UniProtKB/Swiss-Prot annotation:
Gene: ureF
Molecular function GO labels: nickel cation binding
GO CC field: cytoplasm
Family matches, as InterPro entries: UreF, UreF_sf
UniProt family annotation: Belongs to the UreF family.
UniProt keyword annotations, A-Z: Chaperone, Cytoplasm, Nickel insertion
Official protein name in the record: Urease accessory protein UreF
Subunit field text: UreD, UreF and UreG form a complex that acts as a GTP-hydrolysis-dependent molecular chaperone, activating the urease apoprotein by helping to assemble the nickel containing metallocenter of UreC. The UreE protein probably delivers the nickel.
Organism listed in the record: Sinorhizobium medicae (strain WSM419)
Ranges in coiled-coil conformation: none
Domain of life of the native organism: Bacteria
Length: 223
């Protein structure tokens, strides 16, 4: 089947990765709230560095690889199940596991309005990047557009977290999105050409923040 590099594919990606899509991503910070609480992220510049680091060598990079593999594997039940199990195992903390699995479950439920028989193998539960990748692959949106939409949505959610935590305003938050565009583009190109052999990360502070967050006394987010 040919890739749908057209308006329909674009509309679907914009819808699926929109803040209005009912997955509940607004309630998760991926450890960013803890980093803000510790004074590790205090400005728009800090936020940009945080996002770019995760994109290039953190869990966001791994999510991009998992999405790519799921996109390619959508018609191969055994391969798709394997990447789904791997994605769940890679969750580095209890809250990170909760976040990726609940987002993935909600995404699959909402994406049911765009049914495809090959998605039945996932059932109702899969990690978030696997759910997005499999659905995008089944509907042939194009891998690079799917990656770009997913990564941009991830950064957008981090900006929303930062605004609600009071470390940046809306204008500077949008500025972060503008300044991260080139990094997203580079990561899209890398991830589309990479494989699961390229999984890995070196963002220990972010991982520890995710672990510590569950003990944060007063918080706005679930992770």
């Amino acid at each position: 089947m040919a890739e749908h590099a057209d308006t329909q594919a674009l509309l679907r990606l914009v819808t699926w990765l929109s803040p209005a899509f009912p997955v509940g991503s607004f309630s998760y910070s991926g450890g960013l709230e803890q980093a803000i609480h510790q004074g590790l992220v205090t400005s728009a510049d800090d936020l940009r560095l945080w996002c770019e680091t995760l994109l290039e060598r953190g869990n966001t990079w791994n999510d991009a690889l998992l999405l790519s593999e799921s996109y390619r594997a959508y018609g191969d039940a055994q391969r798709l199940i394997a990447v789904s199990e791997l994605a769940e195992a890679l969750a580095g903390s209890r809250e990170r596991h909760m976040e990726t699995m609940l987002l993935g479950e909600a995404f699959l439920a909402a994406a049911g309005h765009w049914p495809h028989p090959s998605l039945a193998v996932l059932g109702t539960k899969a990690a978030y990047p696997v759910s997005v990748g499999a659905v995008a692959g089944a509907h042939r949106t194009g891998l690079k557009p799917a990656l770009a939409a997913f990564l941009n949505a991830t950064v957008s959610n981090a900006v929303s977290v930062a605004i609600r935590c009071g470390i940046t305003g809306q204008r500077d938050g949008v500025g972060v999105l503008a300044r991260v565009e080139d990094t997203i583009g580079a990561v899209v190109a890398r991830a589309a050409a990479a494989s699961l052999e390229d999984l890995g990360g070196a963002t220990f502070i972010a991982e520890i923040a995710s672990l510590k967050h569950e003990n944060l006394h007063s918080r706005l987010f679930r992770s």
